[in-house]
Amino acid sequence: MALYIIFLLIASSFILFSFIFSQKPKGKLPPGPPKLPIIGNIHQTVGGLPHYVFRDLAKKYGPIMHLQLGQVSIMVVSSPRLAEEVLKTNDIVVANRPYSLVGDIVLYGSSDVAFGSYGDYWRQMKKIMTVEVLSAKKVAAISGTRQQEVNNLMEYIRSTCGKPFHVREHVMQRNNNIICKSLFGDNCKQQHVLIESLDEMMKLSTGFNVSDLFPNWGFLPVISGYKSTLTRIHKNIDSILSEIFEERKIKRQKGGASDEDMLDVLLNIKERGGLEFPVADNNIKAIFVNMFVGGTDTSVATIEWAMTELMRNPKVMSKAQAEVRQLFKGKNTILDKDLQDLVYLKYIIKETLRLHPVVPILLPRECRGPCKIGGYDIPMNTVLFVNAFACSTDPEYWDDAESFKPERFENSSLDLNGRACEYLPFGAGRRMCPGITFGMSVVEIILAQLLYYFNWELPNGLSPNDIDLTPNFGAVADKKVPLQIVPTLNSLK
């Protein structure tokens, strides 16, 4: 008991000392809500979905606002005009990521592309991912793997026609298979365990972890068990990946190198050498964790949200099915190359990503130096958040912004590449997601086949208005209530 009291006294003194002597940012800062001692504005950001909370606060305090979350000073941008100042005008200045214990422990010292600090090493690895791993050519090269898993999904649905189909569960299973086979071929014996560990990591990455909000208090992740949990997750992931790597190296020694999958591609790059920063196994592992995290939940959530909106909007569903069925009339198999002319389906996907962005708040950026945004002074080391959801539903830029209208993309130059900041499904600038082509290849082929081969109804007499549209609280904003729909087989005549 005495030791406990002593600990409390020491901790209280440390907290008070930190509060009294903490430096306040200088200059003309953006407005924001009043702060409490020590916790700042933390109490105003809990209790709701962050992209909704930030949007509602922005209505009161403006399109750029200052929040103090514990010891971390953040700015939240909620308008396309100011998002452009962040992601384009000041892109190089705000190209860093803030420190994350998850990145440090699980992602091999943040040596990955998603969470790594901006610099020469990061630029090299981003180029490798963009050119060697995730280019359109490489994505096309694994179309056979993608097609096989999608065919398996369609066969499963055929075998269960008339029964409720759990969209997320079954699409997730096939999508995970696509990613594993794309990375490792068929060599992923512990795929289920690997996915479970990655899911646990994602859950721990959700929201604002107290350890990241009070980085000066190094004891927090220790006494809370957060650090030990992350270490356990890292060991699980590393053990599985190390086994895969060792088996592949033995195979390569016997039969030579190839370009069959992404592991071979990256091992070839490692063995060729000649890079400014030699690529180690751990660097490749970090990229693979990025691929899993960025390619699993996001694609599946997009498919589920798209099917949700199609079920809620029967006229849109009918128009989409008519397009697919007219284009593929009589075909028993649909290939990637057949998707080029599905114009209306692409509008549906764009509108889904506008109204239901799977990453509604872009990954945070950190200022490498001071800059100005919206006429305000943004100090060095400030963390910046862009509320992509607020931008893509801003009524100044979008007519009837809360409604699902794929036709709004007719004669529109907006694309998925972040050229206009009112539409940022994958971010923009240097930190834009490099996996757009890979992810969209899965989304398009699955949606096209779901619409071509099957008709869909809601179970148990539900009406379209009964569908719950509440997003989940998580790193990916999928549906809180998973979508279940009933398929019946469409005649291909």
Curated annotation (Swiss-Prot):
Q: What is its main location?
A: membrane
CDD domains for this protein: CYP71-like (cd11072)
Protein's pathway: Secondary metabolite biosynthesis; terpenoid biosynthesis
Annotated GO biological processes are: sesquiterpene biosynthetic process; terpenoid biosynthetic process
- Glycan attachment residues as annotated in the record: 209, 411
Question: Highest taxon of the source?
Answer: Eukaryota
GO CC entries = membrane
According to the UniProt entry, its GO molecular function terms are: heme binding; iron ion binding; monooxygenase activity; oxidoreductase activity, acting on paired donors, with incorporation or reduction of molecular oxygen
InterPro entries assigned to the protein according to its UniProt record, in alphabetical order? Cyt_P450, Cyt_P450_CS, Cyt_P450_E_grp-I, Cyt_P450_sf
The cofactor required is:
heme
Give membrane topology per the record. Answer: Single-pass type II membrane protein
**PANTHER family from the entry?**
CYTOCHROME P450 (PTHR47955:SF13), CYTOCHROME P450 FAMILY 71 PROTEIN (PTHR47955)
Q: Output this protein's name.
A: Cytochrome P450 Tp9025
